[in-house]
């Protein structure tokens, strides 16, 4: 008996077309998600071609799609087998809309099954790289080279195709690797063209988007800026908006965009909890307040946060206490500076996909904030702070936010800033956080960033930082015995932070960093290098 894999959670289907602006209706590729780990990646690949795409629930009906008016529909992969009991299925009327459809892996098998074909457990599954042998190089496979490497991940196989379908390509183990019903514009691929391992995948996606769906390149940064400013002004009017500025690319880009849209009706609040990197709070205020003339309400809460962490060693308790204190400070300061009608959040599109638990005001239909965005790692705001939300970035992926930031004048030091956890250095100090330990780690971390920055390799790494351990080791300095802290260096390469590999940093660079730390940072006499990937480890130590 086949073990049933739970179907993906249902994305709210209420008023789906209302989420899409008039400009994008009729120029959108919809991805119906069946629980694939790559659904977001498909959307990103399509957007890279300057065509808008959205990920919707597989339960989205044909009627709802008619209202959205997509130029094309993609059925994602998924963890199920189409013959599993309760396996997710789409509305079969979708295939009668006259809109081009591309099924990917599970999506192809589902299309075959729903249109009268047959899918069976493959005699031999196919996982990893495979050579694609092209039988028909037209339409979907135009400009895809024969014997291109494609990424396979399937245990089932299509054995009988529905009427009207033909085989476009095969692999050594999969007779039906790409199929098409040209008359109805229905296509399927057993591989994943969206992943980086699929060499001809981008060409295939462009073929579907432009040659089959006949899309136009309307998803541009300039068009997004113009539309966002118009939407923010329409939503907010002359009312006041509060933004909690963190210094990261999301909140900084949001601040620039909102200030361009509503000017002085935006209030940026920066709560300095004392756990940022060396010089960052001062630099943030200087950039926004003095250089770009976007006023920032600076709140020095360092002592309050540090007091909350006295004697605390558990990492989850640290996060909880930091989050709780952030809420207290935020509430006090918003009451002092307010009143405000709106809370601006740097919610991104992956957050929208992952969570459909937004609260809706029954009178206005607007989403109401009961939480501060999870990237702050601070938990929820009190329910009596009933701000309405303004979220101009909620259609964007992280890489699109960076492009937007550059376009509106955000400096590169923020646009390409390494990801930094909400609790900051507090979770890079293993054990209790004290003022002394913060100073040690802040100095060590500065040396790491300084050495790779002056060599011009800062952007070669997803993250590069130091971790302070709560132990001591014996050393010898100046013919004297020392007993001081070891520091861990953590250098990571990654595309999105979901998986990561430890970076092969040249020894001479590691040596230079180590020498500076043990000579310049009082309280450290040993430096070690973390060579753990994610998985099994995580990027951060806590």
Swiss-Prot record:
Stretches assigned to the GMPS ATP-PPase domain: 219-417
Superkingdom of this protein's organism: Bacteria
Domain spans labelled Glutamine amidotransferase type-1: 28-218
A GO term from the CC aspect: cytosol
Keyword Plastid: no
Enzyme Commission (EC) number: 6.3.5.2
Keyword Metal-binding on entry: no
PROSITE patterns tied to this protein: GATASE_TYPE_1 (PS51273), GMPS_ATP_PPASE (PS51553)
Subunit structure: Homodimer.
Protein name: GMP synthase [glutamine-hydrolyzing]
């Amino acid at each position: 008996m086949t073990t049933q894999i739970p179907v993906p959670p249902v994305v709210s289907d209420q008023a789906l077309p209302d989420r899409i602006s008039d400009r994008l209706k009729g120029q959108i590729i919809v991805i119906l998600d069946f629980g694939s780990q790559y659904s977001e990646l498909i959307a990103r690949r399509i957007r890279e071609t300057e065509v808008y795409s959205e990920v919707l629930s597989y339960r989205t009906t044909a009627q709802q799609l008619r209202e959205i008016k997509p130029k094309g529909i993609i059925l994602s992969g998924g963890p199920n087998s189409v013959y599993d009991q309760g396996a997710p299925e789409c509305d079969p009327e979708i295939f009668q809309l006259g809109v081009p459809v591309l099924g990917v892996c599970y999506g192809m098998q589902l299309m075959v099954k729903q249109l009268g074909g047959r899918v069976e457990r493959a005699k031999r599954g196919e996982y990893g790289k495979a050579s694609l042998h092209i039988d028909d190089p037209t339409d979907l496979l135009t400009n895809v080279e024969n014997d291109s490497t494609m990424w396979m991940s399937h245990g089932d196989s299509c054995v009988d195709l529905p009427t009207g379908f033909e085989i476009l390509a095969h692999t050594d183990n999969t007779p039906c690797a790409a199929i098409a019903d040209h008359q109805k514009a229905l296509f399927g691929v057993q591989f994943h063209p969206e992943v980086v391992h699929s060499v001809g995948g981008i060409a295939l996606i462009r073929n579907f988007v432009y040659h089959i769906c006949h899309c136009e390149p309307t998803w541009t940064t300039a068009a997004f800026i113009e539309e966002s400013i118009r939407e923010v002004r329409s939503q907010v009017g002359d009312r006041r908006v509060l933004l909690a500025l963190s210094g990261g690319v999301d909140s900084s880009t949001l601040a620039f965009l909102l200030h361009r849209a509503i000017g002085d009706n935006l209030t940026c609040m920066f709560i300095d909890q004392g756990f940022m990197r060396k010089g960052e709070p001062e630099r943030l205020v200087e950039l926004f307040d003095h250089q770009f003339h976007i006023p920032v309400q600076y709140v020095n809460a360092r002592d309050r946060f540090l007091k909350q962490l006295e004697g605390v060693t558990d990492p989850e308790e640290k996060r909880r206490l930091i989050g709780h204190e952030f809420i207290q400070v935020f509430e006090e300061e918003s009451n002092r500076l307010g009143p405000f009608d709106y809370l601006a959040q740097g919610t991104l599109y992956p957050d929208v996909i992952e969570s459909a638990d937004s609260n809706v005001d029954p009178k206005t239909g607007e989403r109401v904030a009961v939480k501060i965005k999870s990237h702050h790692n601070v938990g929820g705001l009190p329910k009596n702070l009933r701000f309405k939300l303004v979220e101009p970035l909620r259609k964007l992926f992280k890489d699109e936010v960076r492009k937007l930031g550059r376009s509106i004048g955000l400096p590169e030091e923020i646009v390409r800033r390494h990801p930094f956890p909400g609790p900051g250095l507090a979770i890079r100090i293993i054990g209790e956080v004290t003022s002394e330990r913060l100073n040690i780690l802040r100095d060590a971390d500065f040396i790491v960033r300084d050495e790779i920055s002056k060599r011009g390799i800062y952007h070669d790494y997803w993250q590069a930082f130091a971790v302070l351990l709560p132990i001591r080791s014996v050393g010898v300095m100046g013919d004297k015995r020392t007993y001081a802290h070891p520091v861990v260096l953590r250098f990571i390469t990654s595309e999105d932070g979901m998986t990561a590999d430890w970076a092969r940093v040249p020894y001479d660079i590691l040596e230079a960093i180590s020498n500076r730390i043990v000579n310049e940072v009082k309280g450290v006499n040993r430096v070690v290098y973390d060579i753990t990937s994610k998985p099994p480890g995580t990027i951060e130590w806590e």
